[in-house]
Amino acid sequence: MTESQRMSRTLAEVDPEIYQAIQHETARQDGQLELIASENFTSEAVLEATGSVFTNKYAEGYPGKRYYGGCEYTDVVENLARERASKLFGAEYVNVQPHSGSQANQAAYGAVVSPGDTVMGLNLAHGGHLTHGHALNFSGKTYKIVPYNVRKEDELIDYDEVEKLAREHQPKMIIAGASAYPRIIDFARFRKIADAVGAVFLVDMAHISGLVAAGVHPNPCEFADIVTSTTHKTLRGPRAGIILAREKYGKEIDKNVFPGTQGGPLVHVMAAKAVCFLEALQPEFAVYQRQVVANAKALAQSLIDAGFRVVSGGTDTHVVLLDVFSKGLRGKESEQALDRARITVNKNAIPFDTNPPMNPSGIRLGSPAVTTRGFKEAEMREVGTLIAEVLTNIANEDVIAGVRQKVQALTTRFPLYSWKRDTVQA
């Protein structure tokens, strides 16, 4: 066999174990209801770009200023991604090289604050993110973190507390954004608070960027100095990151992405980002995002009607945070029981949680992935009923088996990657 012939073999021929794992994962995604709020399903076009020959290319630097030759088409890809993201979000500056949302945040920190500086962010236990100041994360290890919280009475961000803390601690940067906060964030109020103390205002919109792109959520680019995001989740692109900012921060951000925190960018992933931004610029994307929010609201109301407590009383976004501890349950057992019914969620802390993070008081639900499948409000109400049925019969495997059959009926009605269905093995 020649080297050319060897390189032309299929994955199934070269590595049947990995091939089978992919087949099984495809079947799993097709046969389960994906309700993890941070997950979604990309288009075939995004998958194709991610698996393209740009995987082979090294391209340290930026368009027109590379440290490697042969980057003319890489420059085309990166420029298209930047131009489309700028148009999509109305940003003056764009960097599409970050490998992830966390690395986007790390580069943004490095551009505007120094080690030891004071930074404010939403407490992880109240819905924030690891990179907003958790003690075990680079952010908590490198900077002096002052967390702010939600109010106990309504589980909404306490903007008066944010302002009081900002005036007391004089932070160099204030972060707005969350991983488990279901309500619209008042970016204008944050901007006013940041201006009052001379702080840089950064928004991490990783969870809501798709909603923002479609105009169904306020755009943080109108208020923030720097905006970071992932490109998967609601944006429905590849697993990666992006930074948007006012032009005056561009040079420092560029330096902190490369060479500050990364070497060569993942060109194949930048190509997939460009595709996802183009998809998000289409009118039908706004229709999809409006349905995402409508579906989350329908799911939340269905669970409330079934007697469950939804954190903050509902949702304005794609996220529903469910308090299961009030029903005598814990997040871990709830996640596992729902998984047996082929409903995928994640255990999650709720505000003022007294239970440990690995077995907290809640579960987090999200509507993006099932909306991609075609679910609307009626299906979401049915899903809420199925979740309630499992959680009120958590030790009854007969009930769970019955729910599993109903889930199978739903996934059959709304196939995922239907062109793959006949080729995969469960």
UniProtKB/Swiss-Prot annotation:
Write out the GO cellular component annotations.
cytosol
- Family annotation (Gene3D superfamilies): Aspartate Aminotransferase, domain 1, Type I PLP-dependent aspartate aminotransferase-like (Major domain)
Q: Which PROSITE patterns match?
A: SHMT
Marked site, Plays an important role in substrate specificity, at H232
Q: What GO terms are given for molecular function?
A: glycine hydroxymethyltransferase activity; pyridoxal phosphate binding
Q: Which residues bind (6S)-5,6,7,8-tetrahydrofolate?
A: L124, G128, H129, L130
Superkingdom classification of source: Bacteria
Q: Does the keyword Transferase apply?
A: yes
Question: Which CDD domains does the protein's record reference?
Answer: SHMT
- To which pathway does this protein belong? One-carbon metabolism; tetrahydrofolate interconversion; Amino-acid biosynthesis; glycine biosynthesis; glycine from L-serine: step 1/1
Query: Recorded E.C. number(s)?
Result: 2.1.2.1
Q: Which UniProt keywords apply?
A: Amino-acid biosynthesis, Cytoplasm, One-carbon metabolism, Pyridoxal phosphate, Transferase
Keyword field contains Amino-acid biosynthesis? yes
Intracellular or extracellular location(s): Cytoplasm
Cofactor names from the entry are:
pyridoxal 5'-phosphate
Q: Which reaction does it catalyse?
A: (6R)-5,10-methylene-5,6,7,8-tetrahydrofolate + glycine + H2O = (6S)-5,6,7,8-tetrahydrofolate + L-serine
Among the GO biological process terms of this entry, one is:
glycine biosynthetic process from serine
Q: What class of enzyme is it?
A: transferase
Q: What is its main location?
A: cytoplasm
Q: Which residues carry this modification: N6-(pyridoxal phosphate)lysine?
A: K233
Q: How does it assemble?
A: Homodimer.
PANTHER family in alphabetical order: SERINE HYDROXYMETHYLTRANSFERASE, SERINE HYDROXYMETHYLTRANSFERASE 1
Spell out the NCBIfam families in the cross-references.
Answer: PRK00011.1
Task of the protein: Catalyzes the reversible interconversion of serine and glycine with tetrahydrofolate (THF) serving as the one-carbon carrier. This reaction serves as the major source of one-carbon groups required for the biosynthesis of purines, thymidylate, methionine, and other important biomolecules. Also exhibits THF-independent aldolase activity toward beta-hydroxyamino acids, producing glycine and aldehydes, via a retro-aldol mechanism.
Q: Which family does it belong to?
A: Belongs to the SHMT family.
The protein's name: Serine hydroxymethyltransferase
Protein species of origin = Solibacter usitatus (strain Ellin6076)
